[in-house]
Design a protein with these regions (language model features):
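Intrinsically disordered, low-complexity regulatory segments
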Residues: 1-164, 168
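Histidine-centered active-site/metal-ligand motif
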Residues: 44, 192, 206
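Short, amphipathic alpha-helical segments that act as regulatory/interfacial helices
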Residues: 114, 118, 196, 200-203
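Short coil/turn segments at secondary-structure boundaries
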Residues: 153-160, 177-184, 213
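Short amphipathic alpha-helical "interface-anchor" segments enriched in bulky aromatics
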Residues: 162, 166-170, 191-196
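Charge-patterned, long linear interaction tracts outside catalytic cores
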Residues: 176-201
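Conserved small/polar residues in nucleotide/adenosyl-binding loops
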Residues: 205-211
């Protein structure tokens, strides 16, 4: 019997989907039934590696090493997520699985979460996209009746990779630069720093009032 592997973004969503499509038999890390295997990520299972993964010397924050500009991105697996990632890789390679459904959240970040796992596993099996904005049973059924080709969302994945890379480049380099220059850890980020500038556009106003003796 062949199966379609469905990968959600989190366990609660996977359970909701499984209940609708009939995957009602619980296994270790996934559910099976009615021609489906339903499993899940736990947020990001792969994260951009820290600078020292590119060169050992980057473990120490030095002005001379800036800017740090990786030619190719490297990814790391958080220790607490290795088991689930290994399971997803095994399911993708399972000979009974003939296609995969990306059922992560309908958005840029959800696309990134799934695609990184799909690529890490070296999966070449056909991939479709479940794109829904509601977790109501009717919406899930409608979504599975109208799955989209995975390639329709290639540009969304590219945008997510660019966003993550921009955050890394600005966050790593700017944080190290200002921290080294001022001798104290100063966190700088692509979103955080402009937001702070909007909230506090100039230095606080200092008022000097003369004292009057009565």
């Amino acid at each position: 019997m062949s199966y379609q592997l469905v990968i959600a973004e989190k366990p609660s969503v996977a359970r909701s989907i499984a209940g609708v499509i009939g995957a009602d038999k619980k296994q270790d890390g996934y559910m099976v039934g009615n021609g489906y295997l339903v499993s899940w990520c736990v947020g990001h299972l792969l994260e951009l590696a820290q600078p020292e993964a590119y060169k050992e010397q980057y473990a120490k924050w030095r002005y001379e090493d800036l800017p740090i500009l990786p030619e190719n991105w490297k990814y790391e697996v958080p220790k607490d997520k290795k088991t689930q990632l290994a399971l997803l890789c095994r399911l993708m390679k399972d000979k009974r699985v003939d296609s995969v459904v990306c059922a992560t959240d309908a958005g840029r970040e959800g696309e990134l979460i799934f695609r990184l796992v799909y690529e890490y596993a070296g999966c070449k099996k056909p991939m479709e996209r479940l794109w829904i904005s509601s977790m109501e049973d009717a919406a899930i059924r409608e979504g599975f009746d109208h799955l989209h080709p995975g390639s329709d969302y290639d540009k969304l994945y590219d945008a997510a990779v660019c966003r993550a890379g921009a955050d890394w480049l600005i966050g790593i380099n700017a944080t190290r630069l200002f921290s080294v220059l001022y001798g104290v850890t100063l966190n700088v980020g692509r979103v955080m720093s402009p937001t702070l500038a909007l909230l506090v556009p100039v230095s606080y106003t200092h008022l000097t009032l003369p004292t009057i003796r009565l």
